[in-house]
Every structure is written in C-alpha cells, then in structure tokens.
Amino acid sequence: MTKTLEDRIIKLEETVYFQEKTISELNDALTQQQLQLDEMHKLQQAVEIKLRQMAPLLRDADAGDDGPPPHYL
C-alpha cells in the first residue's frame, strides 16, 4: 500500500469514528429530550384535569356576584 492511500484510509477511519461518536451523542440528547417531553405531557394532563375540576367552582363563584360593585353603592 502506498503512503497516500494509507493516509486516506486513516483519514476515512477517523471521519467514521467521529461521525459515529456524534450520532451516539445526538441519540443520547434525543432520548433525554423525549423523556422530558413525556414528563411535560404528564404534567399538562394533570393541569387539565385540575382545571376541569375547578371550572364548576369558578362558575358557581361568579354566579353570586350579580349586584353592583361596592364602589357604586
């Protein structure tokens, strides 16, 4: 094998190594983001449930305020 061919092969091997390393790091980051997204989705669902539970209470509280505000009296 000639020196230039050997150098080219070494360069290609280095490139493949760094690409594989980058792909692995990106995969780790994507996995972490998906876990965070799943957690945020669970929290959003919990907030929606709480809001649905509170909606009747808020409507009932608003129903009693039919009179004029105190500063109009």
From Swiss-Prot:
InterPro entries linked: SlyX
Pfam families: SlyX
Transmembrane segments annotated in the record for this chain: none
Source superkingdom: Bacteria
Gene3D superfamilies: 1.20.5.300
PANTHER family per the UniProt record, alphabetical: PROTEIN SLYX (PTHR36508:SF1)
Similarity remark: Belongs to the SlyX family.
Entry protein name: Protein SlyX homolog
Species this chain originates from: Oleidesulfovibrio alaskensis (strain ATCC BAA-1058 / DSM 17464 / G20) (Desulfovibrio alaskensis)
